[in-house]
Design a protein with these regions (language model features):
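N-terminal strand-loop element at the rim of the active site
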Residues: 5-66, 161
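Nucleotide-sugar donor phosphate/pyrophosphate-binding loop at the beta->alpha transition
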Residues: 67-71, 110, 117-137, 149-157, ...
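Conserved donor-binding/catalytic core segment of Leloir-type glycosyltransferases
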Residues: 2-6, 190-199
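Glycine-rich phosphate-binding loop signature in dinucleotide/nucleotide-binding domains
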Residues: 78-84, 190
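Active-site proximal beta-strand in glycosyltransferases
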Residues: 3, 85, 102-119, 141
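A short helix/loop element that forms part of the nucleotide-sugar donor recognition site in Leloir-type
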Residues: 175-190
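Short His-centered aromatic/hydrophobic patch
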Residues: 88-96, 115
Length: 199
């Protein structure tokens, strides 16, 4: 099976990059041929590219500039139409027509679009992007339900082809708890007026 994953860059200081690294390093790369289409890592950041390449991921490095990356993706897909899966990490309205471009150039690929963001306010342009994503993508992932709704539409989480990729905070496990707060403060001798940040 041949997979194309599209992301921004491979610096290790971001959740998206860490998600990509963790996913690919835990994938059986003897069964799956993975091409990772990414922008060049900023020079001031450590890159996870060496670890991915050592594991067998083929990295296609392109400029970390949105317009240049779209042009490079178009050129790549014109000559590489044999992907079974395209996993597209997206965070913008421009990703919607890019999803359409992928569908036209690789009509047999299963397209997975993956949102990691929630940036209100919602605009009419975003509403149009929702429709375009829903027209061309096969599956929808969000790092949380809110991220899925923001990029793909208000009710996307009601569709059977939407899933949460668990790299967000699980609010059923991590939430304010008055009893736990009181117990921790008592255990460490921290008064109610003192500020406490937990990491």
């Amino acid at each position: 099976m041949k997979i194309l994953m599209i992301s921004n860059h491979l610096g290790v200081q971001s959740g998206v990059q860490r998600y990509v690294q963790n996913l690919l390093l835990n994938l059986d790369l003897t069964r799956y041929q993975v091409d990772l289409f990414v922008g060049l890592c900023p020079p001031d950041q450590a890159s996870c590219a060496p670890a991915l390449e050592a594991a067998g991921v083929h990295i296609i490095a392109v400029p970390d500039n949105k317009k240049a990356r779209i042009r490079a993706l178009y050129q790549h897909l014109k000559t590489h139409k044999d992907y079974d899966i395209i996993h597209y990490h997206t965070a913008s309205k421009i990703g919607a027509p890019v999803c359409g471009m992928m569908r036209v150039l690789c009509p047999h690929a299963k397209i997975i679009v993956h949102s990691h963001i929630v940036y209100p306010p919602m605009t009419l342009t975003w509403r149009a992007a929702h429709l375009v994503y829903q027209l061309f993508a096969d599956y929808f992932l969000g790092c949380g339900v809110a991220a899925g709704r923001f990029v793909f539409g208000d009710h996307i989480d009601r569709r059977p082809n939407f899933s949460v990729a668990c790299n967000a905070v699980d609010q059923t496990r991590f939430y304010p708890n008055a009893a736990a707060r009181t117990a921790i403060r008592a255990q460490y001798g921290i008064t109610e007026t003192e500020r406490l940040a937990g990491f």
